[in-house]
C-alpha cells in the first residue's frame, strides 16, 4: 500500500489552510458555548466535520481517515475510559460502605471552610495523584470527593480542572518532559529545569485565582495566609526538585510537602469567617463535628480505598514495574499490540514538523494488566475485601457505575476519534505551523501551541509528542533557546487541560453532570485563555529579558 504524505498547506497559503483546519475546533467551541449541545452530540458532529476536512481539503485516503477515527475511538475506551470507570467505582465503594461520611468528617476536622478543603483535596491530593497516575484520574477522583463534601458538582469539576494546572507538566512520573526530550534530542533534565522555572509562578497565581472564583476578593483576603503556605511550599519544592533531582518526582515531592505544610498550618490558623456553598452555615458544621468523633483507626479504615489507590497507582508507575511490560521485559507477552489496518506506517509526517519524512505508527496497545485503570481496579478489589463489602453489592455497584458512565464513555471515544483524525490528517500540524509563522512574536504564541496540542489530545505528553520538535525548529529559526520553547510547549499545555474535550467529559462523568459539558466548558474556557497568555508573557520575558533563567 502506498505511503500517503501529509500536506500541511493544501491551500498554498498557511493562514488560509489554518482557517480551514480550524473549522472543527471552531464548531466545537460554538456548539458548547452558544448552541449548548450535550458533549456527546458536539463531539460526534465535530468528528464528522473533521472527517470532511481531512477527506475534501487534505485529500486523505478514505480508508486511512476512517481507520484513524476507529483507532481514536478505541483508544478513548482503553486506556482512558477504563481509568474513569475504575476511579468512579472506588469512590462508589467508599460511599456504599458508609466510609465516605467518616472521610468527610476527617476533612472537616482539619477545616470546615470549603475554600481550604479545595486546597487540601483539589490541589494537594490532586497534584499527588497527577504525579503518580495522570491521564484524567486526579480530576475524576478529587471532583467526586469534593461533591461528597458538599460542593456544587459544576464547581467541583470546574475548580478541579483549573487547579490541576499546577502539576500536569510533571504528571505520571514526568512522562511529558521525558517525551519532549525524546522527540527533540534535547536533555530532558534541562527541559524539566526550565519548566521548573516557569510553573512555580503560575502555581501561586492559580491558587489565588481559585479563591477569587469561589468567594471573590473577600475570599482572597481571608485565605491568603493558607494560599501562601500551600502554594509557596509547593512552588519552592517544585523548583528545587525539578532543578536538582529530575523531572520524574516534582509532583510527588511538591504535593506531599504542600499537604504537610498546609495541614500543620491549619492546626494553628483558620479564617475568621467559615465559607461554605449553599445554605449550610458554619454553626451547623461545628455541631456535626461536635456530635461525631472518630478514632484514628476508623479514619484510616475509611480512607483505605484511596490509600490502596495511591499505593497501587504508585507501584504501577515506578520504572521497574513499567520495565516488566516494555519490549524485552519479562511480562511483555501480556501486552497485546495490534497494528491498525489501513493506517499503521501508511501516513508520513513531513518536515518541518519532524526532521525528516517519518512513517506515522498506529499500533493499538491493549495493556490489560499494566494500564493505570487496572491499578485502580486492584485498589477497588482490595477495598471490597478490607471493608467486607458483599460481593453481590460490589457487582451491583460496578454495574451501576458502567450504566451511569455509558454516555460519557461514548463522548470520550468520540473526542479521541477527533484527536486522532486531526493528527493523522495533518490538520493539527497546519495550525501549529501557522503559529510558528508569527516570527519574533512566537515566544508569546509558543505556549498556545502546547495549549492547542492538549486541547486536541487531552494530554501534555501527546502535545509534546506532536509539537515539541516543531517548537525546537522554530526556536532555532528566530534565534532563541530551543530548551525554552520546548518547555513553553509543556507549560502552555497545562493551561489547555481544563478545556480539553477529554478532560471535560471525564470531569462531568465523575460528578454526574452527563449532558452538561457545555456548562463546564463555559466555566473554564476564559480562565484557560488568561493563563495561557500569562505563560506567553513569562516565556517572552525569559527569552529576551530574563535570559539568565534559561539553563
Curated annotation (Swiss-Prot):
Belongs to the lactate permease family. The chain crosses the membrane at residues 13-33, 37-57, 69-89, 131-151, 159-179, 194-214, 245-265, 306-326, 366-386, 405-425, 438-458, 530-550. It holds the Pfam family Lactate_perm. It comes from the Bacteria. Its main location: membrane. InterPro entries: Lactate_perm (IPR003804). One of its GO terms (molecular function) is solute:proton symporter activity. The keyword tRNA processing does not apply. PANTHER family: GLYCOLATE PERMEASE GLCA-RELATED, L-LACTATE PERMEASE. Coiled coil: none annotated. It catalyses: (S)-lactate(in) + H(+)(in) = (S)-lactate(out) + H(+)(out); (R)-lactate(in) + H(+)(in) = (R)-lactate(out) + H(+)(out); glycolate(in) + H(+)(in) = glycolate(out) + H(+)(out). GO terms for cellular component: plasma membrane. It is a multi-pass membrane protein. Uptake of L-lactate across the membrane. Can also transport D-lactate and glycolate. Seems to be driven by a proton motive force. This is L-lactate permease. The keyword Methyltransferase does not apply. It is found in: Cell inner membrane. Keywords: Cell inner membrane, Cell membrane, Membrane, Symport, Transmembrane, Transmembrane helix, Transport.
